[in-house]
């Protein structure tokens, strides 16, 4: 089921609409939510949990699990320009926890999806287009890398 919620700033007006499951065209999803749906669909061997943690700043968006490799985390980012923006807490997380943690970036204009190691965060802050990725637009390869026993797969 899909609920659309629109709030008008300045005037306290909330419009809550229930839309049938099969008519999602009336609900607009944020680009990060669309990326989340794409990740779930294209990585079936991974059990995903989307984290919306306001109490632990910097924690990545996704917790992944597979019986063979255990847990790992992924940050989802939408690139609207050459630089990817990260909060100071996100930067600290990826710099201090580079093993088994990843960053998945989707280019907003081209739609390309790229997988990066956490250690690539410094390059992503400058220009994601010039930062070497582990995989581009190859979901089978992305899934294999996420499931690899070591982050240097």
Where in this protein do the model-derived segments appear?
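Short strand-connecting beta-turns/loops that link adjacent beta-strands
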Residues: 67-69, 109-110
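Acidic, Ser/Thr-rich peripheral helices and adjacent loops at domain boundaries
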Residues: 123-128
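Mg2+/Mn2+-dependent nuclease catalytic core
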Residues: 79-97
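Acidic-basic catalytic patches of nuclease active cores, encompassing PD-(D/E)XK
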Residues: 6, 11-53, 67, 152-153
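Conserved catalytic cores of phosphodiester-cleaving nucleases, focusing on short active-site segments
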Residues: 62-64, 70-80
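Nucleic-acid nuclease catalytic cores
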Residues: 95-122
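Charged phosphate-binding loop/patch that engages nucleotide di/tri-phosphates or the phosphate backbone
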Residues: 131-153
């Amino acid at each position: 089921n899909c609920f659309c919620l629109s709030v008008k700033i300045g005037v306290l007006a909330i419009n809550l609409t229930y839309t049938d499951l099969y008519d999602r065209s009336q609900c607009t999803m944020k680009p990060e939510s669309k990326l989340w749906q794409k990740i779930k669909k294209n990585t079936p061997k991974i059990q995903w949990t989307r984290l919306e943690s306001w109490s632990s700043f910097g924690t990545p968006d996704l917790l992944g699990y597979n019986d063979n490799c255990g847990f790992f985390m992924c940050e989802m980012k939408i690139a609207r320009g050459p630089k990817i923006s990260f909060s100071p807490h996100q930067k600290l997380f990826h710099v201090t926890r580079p093993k088994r943690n990843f960053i998945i970036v989707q280019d907003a204009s081209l739609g390309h999806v790229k997988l990066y190691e956490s250690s690539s965060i410094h390059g992503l802050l400058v220009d994601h287009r010039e930062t070497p990725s582990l995989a581009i637009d190859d979901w089978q390869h992305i899934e294999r890398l996420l499931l690899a026993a070591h982050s240097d797969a």
